[in-house]
Each structure stands twice: as structure tokens, then as C-alpha cells.
Amino acid sequence: MLSLSKNWNTLIKPNKVAYENFPETNNKAKIVVEPLERGFGLTLGNAMRRVLLSSLQGAAITSIKIPAIEHEFSSIPGVKEDVSEVILNIKGIEVKMHVAEKRIMKLKATGPCVITAGMIETGHDVEILNPDHVICNLAKNKQLEMELTCKVGKGYVLSTNSYEDNLPIGEIAIDALFNPVKSVTYKVENTRVGQVTDYDKLIMFVETNGDLLPEMAVGLAARILQEQLQLFISFEEQEEDKQVKTDALPFSPYLLKRVDELELSVRSANCLKNDNIIYIGDLVKRTESDMLRTPNFGRKSLNEIKEILAKFNLRFGMDVPDWPPENIQELSNRYEDSYN
């Protein structure tokens, strides 16, 4: 029964994951995954988004201590904002920790000045990721001292759910957002494999606070999903004979080789990519006239590809029976040793 149900190897799998960082910052990235089976773009995109926004570990300020201030419904002499406003601003400070243990940071300032996160004395184990973030405004000849406790955690923890129930008198717990991922959006578009045009392309946009690069955040989220889903596999796979008879195909196994594995010039490779030619089988079914009608594809590119095809005893304008096969991705993986 398992052999009949074992189709996870026949489903089309992404060729690669493409990361594109935005030029103004390394904290934003566009991630493109293709091709995927129909419906898998939405399935994977939604799962990855939920994990990215809820389950990654990061650091945050969890409590503050200001001399002579015992609760958030107070005012600080010489400070324009009341304590609740100061706490709200402190919640916006983004931090990165290099150790797992909590650290206490200190802030000392004399007015008049605008107090920012960059004025906090952090030590070597903590970094402030947004040093220009405003905490409060201090009046002339006034002083402010504050201790800020920083910890590692995950998700969003309310001050009322703080895991330290017995804080010292005068220490005020604050809501803590540990997650290093600030936003995740995704969309699903159609993509083409051979002559099939309705596979999924997953496009994700991920922004972090700088604690992690988007590529690392996506990798960690995928690892978390992998660990959780592993528990659902309730059977054992038997090692199968991987020897494949090449004469079982109605065409040459070289047709299953991807054109991006050929040593083509950049111009030729881009022309094939723009024309959605994925496999050599897609290529040899075209005639020379078809190729010359391709935008930016000239006689020089044609001769270059003809020489490469000749090495495999292939040519343009071939009649290939049963092309493209339905399980082209699986066949390409199975016959890889035959054409490499």
C-alpha cells in the first residue's frame, strides 16, 4: 500500500530559492520560490508567515527601574512625557543580545536634551539596533537615571504575564516583543514548467529589525516547521534500488537536463530563460527559425547552442514523443546520473 501512496518524490519541487535584498537596507528581502505544485504556494506561504511572526527567538527590554518611581501612573520630574509614555517609547527600542542570560543596561542624562536609545550604556553583550529612537525629552538642569533589563525570548509577552512574578519594588515590567521579524507578506503567482503554465510561484517579502538577516529568519522558520511536521511521519521508508534503466524512456535522457546547467553565455542563457525554455527537451523541439524569432536571440547564440546540442547527438527541430512528461521533475532527478 505504501508503494502506491508514495508520491512525494513525484511532486514537483522548487529548483532553488532566490533572495533579493533591497538596495537601501539588508533588513528587507524578496524571496521567490518556484515551481511549486498548485496550492502549495498558499500552503507554504501561510505556514511560513505564521512561524516567522510568532516563533523566532530574539531579545527585548522586559522591565525598567527609575529612582523614586514605583509604577507607570507617575510623572518624572523634568521629563515632558509621563511614565506610561516613556514605557511606550522604550517598547520601540530594538535590541540584539549575544548571550542568553539577562543583562541590565543603564541610562544617565542631564538636560536639556532629547534622550534617545543610543544614549543607553549597553556593554559588550547587547546592541541597540535603532539608536536614534526617541525615549523622552528632558528639561534644562534636570537629570534622569534609569536601569533597563534586557532578556532573550520569543513572541510577544505581556507585562502581566511576565515570567518574573516577584520583581523588586520600583521595577516596572513592560510588554516585550521578542520577535526579530517586523513584517511578512506573500503572494502567489503562476509559473511555467515546460508547457504547463499553472504551477505556483511563491513570493515573500520579509523585514527584520536587524537582529537577523531575512535569509536566516526564513531558514530558521523552515527548520521549525520541519521539526514539527517530522512527528507526523508514522512509517519507515525502505532503501530502494536507485539504478534506473535508461532504455525505459521513449526519448534520450539528455532531454531531461536543465538548460541552466549548460555552459552558455549570459546572453543565450537569458534568452532561453525569458522564453520559458527549462529543459533541453523544450529546446530541441524548437526549430532554428523559432529560435531566431526569440527577442535578442541572434545567429551567434544559435550557433553556440547548436554546438552544445551536437555533443549530445541532439539538434533543433526534433520530434520528441510524449514530451513533456507529467512527472518531468521526478524523471530529471532519477536520470541525473545518466546525463552528468
Swiss-Prot record:
Catalysed reactions listed for this entry: RNA(n) + a ribonucleoside 5'-triphosphate = RNA(n+1) + diphosphate
Enzyme Commission (EC) number: 2.7.7.6
Gene Ontology molecular function, alphabetical: DNA binding; DNA-directed RNA polymerase activity; protein dimerization activity
Entry GO terms, CC: cytoplasm; DNA-directed RNA polymerase complex
UniProt-annotated stretches for the region Alpha N-terminal domain (alpha-NTD): 1-236
Stretches the record annotates as Alpha C-terminal domain (alpha-CTD): 246-340
Coiled-coil regions listed in the entry: none
Keyword Acetylation: no
Superkingdom of the organism of origin: Bacteria
Pfam families in UniProt: RNA_pol_A_bac, RNA_pol_A_CTD, RNA_pol_L
GO terms, biological process: DNA-templated transcription
SUPFAM superfamilies: C-terminal domain of RNA polymerase alpha subunit, Insert subdomain of RNA polymerase alpha subunit, RBP11-like subunits of RNA polymerase
InterPro entries xref list: DNA-dir_RNA_pol_insert (IPR011262), DNA-dir_RNA_pol_RpoA/D/Rpb3 (IPR011263), DNA-dir_RpoA (IPR011773), RBP11-like (IPR036603), RNAP_asu_C (IPR011260), RNApol_insert_sf (IPR036643)
Keyword list, A-Z: DNA-directed RNA polymerase, Nucleotidyltransferase, Transcription, Transferase
Oligomer and partners: Homodimer. The RNAP catalytic core consists of 2 alpha, 1 beta, 1 beta' and 1 omega subunit. When a sigma factor is associated with the core the holoenzyme is formed, which can initiate transcription.
Record's function text: DNA-dependent RNA polymerase catalyzes the transcription of DNA into RNA using the four ribonucleoside triphosphates as substrates.
Family label: Belongs to the RNA polymerase alpha chain family.
NCBIfam families documented for this protein: PRK05182.1-2, PRK05182.2-5, rpoA
Free-text note on domains in this protein's UniProt record: The N-terminal domain is essential for RNAP assembly and basal transcription, whereas the C-terminal domain is involved in interaction with transcriptional regulators and with upstream promoter elements.
Protein name (record): DNA-directed RNA polymerase subunit alpha
Gene designation per UniProt: rpoA
